[in-house]
Design a protein with these regions (language model features):
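Covalent nucleotidyltransferase
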Residues: 1-284
């Protein structure tokens, strides 16, 4: 059976619009973009804006849409990019607080009152307290005035919010900030690759097939990421998903304790399986 998918490049204002919500599932990695990656992103966007370029392409994301949970898109690949964009937009809203379109890109709003209904991006990842940290920094009442340079023990959400905050403060003209916001909303774009399924499991399985061949901002996907997603899907089918997540987290913690990369385990496992099955083609 062929794989049916939808792929259409969209600007940020169209990505985060309507009733669409993005769900980062439990099996995904914790947020990991650091100063270097965030600085590269904001510098590229500012340079593109300064040069008045026609647009700025942010890359691909892979999402699964099931008919039984329509408009709740499970993020298979691109969670780091979507999370970082949301952090950037939250900082920009502090400087451009009356921008309803920007506000609506961070949260779903009531059509009549513009009151916040819920965030457009929600993470179910519980490793490293991702849920709590993310909720804290995108909260409408987050105190930007109290922001201080984070120490080494601060979480990545706070560190990256502070980085974006200091970078935007360098744009001293309010009109220029507003124009920069408009550039991001209407000129920056993503390519969402979306698979459809009658239920969550079938939509996810299709998306995982794409996931195996897509790179995340130029970084090859780890063997462990692919195994984790596939094993999670199997566990979900037999209602063992929470048990799997706990077991995986324990495995990861044990690897950290003995200073072993979890991906090395699955690279070895993949090598063994290929040998047992007589596969001689070069490994990717």
């Amino acid at each position: 059976m062929g794989l049916t998918l939808n792929a259409e490049q969209k600007n940020i204002s169209n990505i985060f619009s309507g009733r669409i919500k993005f769900i980062i599932p439990e099996y995904q990695r914790p947020y990991s973009w650091d100063k270097e990656e965030c600085l590269e992103l904001i510098d590229d966007l500012k340079q593109s804006f300064k040069n008045e370029e026609d647009g700025y392409f942010l890359g691909n994301i892979v999402v699964a849409n099931s008919l039984d949970e329509n408009n709740q898109l499970e993020v298979i690949d691109g969670q780091q990019r979507l999370t970082t964009l949301t952090l950037l937009m939250r900082v920009l809203l502090y400087f451009d607080s009356s921008n309803i379109k920007l506000r609506n890109s961070i949260w779903e709003l009531d059509d009549r009152t513009n009151d916040i209904i819920e965030p457009r991006l929600f993470t179910k990842v519980f490793s490293n307290q991702d849920q709590e940290y993310f909720k804290e920094v995108i909260d409408l009442n987050f105190d930007f005035e109290a922001l201080k340079e984070p120490n080494v023990n601060c979480n990545l959400y706070i560190k990256n919010v502070y980085l974006f905050y200091t970078e935007i403060k360098k744009i001293r003209n309010n009109i220029e900030i507003q124009n920069f916001v408009d550039y991001i909303l209407y000129k920056a774009s993503l390519l969402p690759i979306q698979t459809e399924g009658t239920n969550k499991e079938s939509a996810r399985e299709k998306a995982l097939r794409i996931f195996e061949t897509i790179n995340d901002r130029g970084k090859s996907l780890n063997d462990s990421d692919i195994f984790k997603a596939k094993l999670y899907n199997k566990a979900l089918n037999i209602k063992k998903d929470q048990d799997f997540i706990l077991r995986w987290d324990n495995l990861n913690n044990e690897c950290i304790e003995i200073k072993l990369f979890i991906d090395d385990i699955f690279k070895l496992y993949t090598h063994i399986i290929r040998g047992e099955n007589g596969i001689k083609s070069p490994e990717s």
